[in-house]
A protein has these predicted regions:
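Hydrophobic transmembrane alpha-helix bundles
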Residues: 28-37, 41-43, 76-87
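Generic secondary-structure boundary/loop-capping signal
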Residues: 16-17, 45, 60, 112
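Acidic, His/Gly-rich catalytic cores of divalent-metal-dependent hydrolytic chemistry
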Residues: 51-118
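Active-site environment of divalent metal-dependent phosphoester hydrolases
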Residues: 13-15, 38-51, 65-70
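Conserved catalytic scaffold of divalent metal-dependent phosphoesterases
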Residues: 1-38
Length: 118
């Protein structure tokens, strides 16, 4: 539909930069320096939609390691014709995932801890 899109891990200016939901406007406005209509970024696992910039900016969240203390998978749907974006959630049974983690590597508690954060 003619949109210029940038996909990046951390931010448009640094692969490993953390763009958190509470980022200042000064930091967020750096996204406007890109020559695109929409930026999708990740790294923090926090779902974000910033529509107050000249560039629509979206972190779709995380399917397996949510950091916003909301259970389940989070992702974004982008309607390119309407240029409308929405975040979606799907709750899933963590017990099965945690059991699989324990079976695969019983000594690695990191992923188990991430999945059960409150």
């Amino acid at each position: 539909d003619g949109h210029k899109v940038l996909l990046c891990h951390g931010s448009p200016w640094d692969l490993n930069y953390y763009l958190y939901p509470d980022a200042t406007y000064e930091v967020r406005s750096r996204i406007e320096r890109t020559d695109v209509d929409i930026v999708f970024f990740g790294h923090t696992h926090y779902p974000i939609i910033w529509d107050d910039l000249n560039v629509l900016s979206v972190n779709p969240g995380s399917v397996g390691q949510p950091r916003d203390r909301s259970p389940g998978a989070c992702w974004a749907i982008w309607d390119t014709r309407e240029n409308n974006i929405s975040l979606k959630r799907e709750i899933y049974d963590l017990k099965n995932i945690i059991q699989a983690c324990k079976k695969y590597d019983p000594n690695d508690k990191y992923l188990q801890d991430v999945l059960t954060r409150e």
